[in-house]
Amino acid sequence: MNPNQILENLKKELSENEYENYIAILKFNEKQSKADFLVFNAPNELLAKFIQTKYGKKISHFYEVQSGNKASVLIQAQSAKQSSKSTKIDIAHIKAQSTILNPSFTFESFVVGDSNKYAYGACKAISQKDKLGKLYNPIFIYGPTGLGKTHLLQAVGNASLEMGKKVIYATSENFINDFTSNLKNGSLDKFHEKYRNCDVLLIDDVQFLGKTDKIQEEFFFIFNEIKNNDGQIIMTSDNPPNMLKGITERLKSRFAHGIIADITPPQLDTKIAIIRKKCEFNDINLSNDIINYIATSLGDNIREIEGIIISLNAYATILGQEITLELAKSVMKDHIKEKKENITIDDILSLVCKEFNIKPSDVKSNKKTQNIVTARRIVIYLARALTALTMPQLANYFEMKDHTAISHNVKKITEMIENDGSLKAKIEELKNKILVKSQS
């Protein structure tokens, strides 16, 4: 059956808006497709990722039901600016993977900053024929969700595929499901052959392997065999090896026997660079005001930021209007409200006072000592950025005459930030600590 006809038939399963906005825009890529591997092009990377996540399995299932044939489905970006490298990947190698790699996850599309440069450097260094499996092995990347761990993992995978290597990328859930399914079907030999005979093993969210001893035993032997054969192993997790719960000591020891690299929340300039990169790659035009608003109003989860950009682009496309700051504020209001409800000014005051080693009562007083004034202005600045408090409410909190005093303090601290890089970094560090605490 013609894959385009499959998409047409999906009309019956989806709402009219869903179909028109996310399915009708897909174009079947006959050149890259095979009998059991269907490739569809979407207008840009963000839409491709969204459609792959939400509708990829549905399209695959619908194709099997209608045609009687099984096929994996890949939704990829069709863009003039898309790296030519992402189109050079051999389909035969892609089919060997547990989960299809996202071709847009490359080193070129990864934004490097102080928060991730060590992890990036380690992954980039081993992505060469004479280094793979030999230089740093294994590599263990850890950090909060949504900061780019999967991007780096798959960047290594895509680079390895271009070198003709056999790559297995799997989440812990994929690995566990593979094992359970093959155990049930009496085909563990097939499972062992798949995982042990690869050149590069990429495991996402390795912390979830700690469900049963049998799963960990299987992974232990697979890990050792790949390592002994000079295969490359890279894993991601939310915590470093020594803090993984439910994982055996011998596995923790293997995980730590290489490079351990953390990824921390990005600073403001890195967040802005990430937003610009996403917009440039997808031909989406956002003004500096909108980019700065997104960067300062949202947390550090890059996937959430991408989701906002997708939503803005979708709103503008569907409504046929320009993306304005007002539209951005409207689209983002629920996200910002949810975050701000978790943060109080008392939380901010407590953290800033601890940092400056001063009393909260001094900051709330009218004392004019320089360090107290600076701390007070930082609290006001962060409260404006991270809470829903209005200027009059802040004036009341600090027992100031009216909101113009708050406005004056915001202006002064903004000027100080522009002229003092170390102060800017300190405020960004405080902001990240507050956001991380609010999400825990």
From Swiss-Prot:
Region (Domain IV, binds dsDNA): 317-440
InterPro entries in alphabetical order: AAA+_ATPase (IPR003593), Chromosome_initiator_DnaA (IPR001957), Chromosome_initiator_DnaA-like (IPR020591), Chromosome_initiator_DnaA_CS (IPR018312), DnaA_C (IPR013159), DnaA_dom (IPR013317), DnaA_N_dom (IPR024633), DnaA_N_sf (IPR038454)
Region (Domain III, AAA+ region): 100-316
Keywords of the record: ATP-binding, Cytoplasm, DNA replication, DNA-binding, Lipid-binding, Nucleotide-binding
Any one Pfam family match given in the protein's UniProt record, by short name: DnaA_N
Recorded coiled-coil stretches: none
Domain of life: Bacteria
A GO molecular function held by the record: ATP binding
Binding of ATP, residues: 146, 148-150
Membrane-spanning segments: none
Location (main, coarse): cytoplasm
CDD domains for the chain: AAA, Bac_DnaA_C
Claim: ATP-binding is one of the keywords in the record: yes
Entries under PROSITE patterns matching the protein: DNAA
GO terms (BP aspect): DNA replication initiation; regulation of DNA replication
SMART domains: AAA, Bac_DnaA_C
Listed GO CC annotations: cytoplasm; plasma membrane
Location in the cell: Cytoplasm
Subunit note: Oligomerizes as a right-handed, spiral filament on DNA at oriC.
Biological function: Plays an essential role in the initiation and regulation of chromosomal replication. ATP-DnaA binds to the origin of replication (oriC) to initiate formation of the DNA replication initiation complex once per cell cycle. Binds the DnaA box (a 9 base pair repeat at the origin) and separates the double-stranded (ds)DNA. Forms a right-handed helical filament on oriC DNA; dsDNA binds to the exterior of the filament while single-stranded (ss)DNA is stabiized in the filament's interior.
Similarity comment: Belongs to the DnaA family.
Protein name as catalogued: Chromosomal replication initiator protein DnaA
Organism: Campylobacter jejuni subsp. jejuni serotype O:6 (strain 81116 / NCTC 11828)
Lineage start: Bacteria, Pseudomonadati, Campylobacterota, Epsilonproteobacteria, Campylobacterales
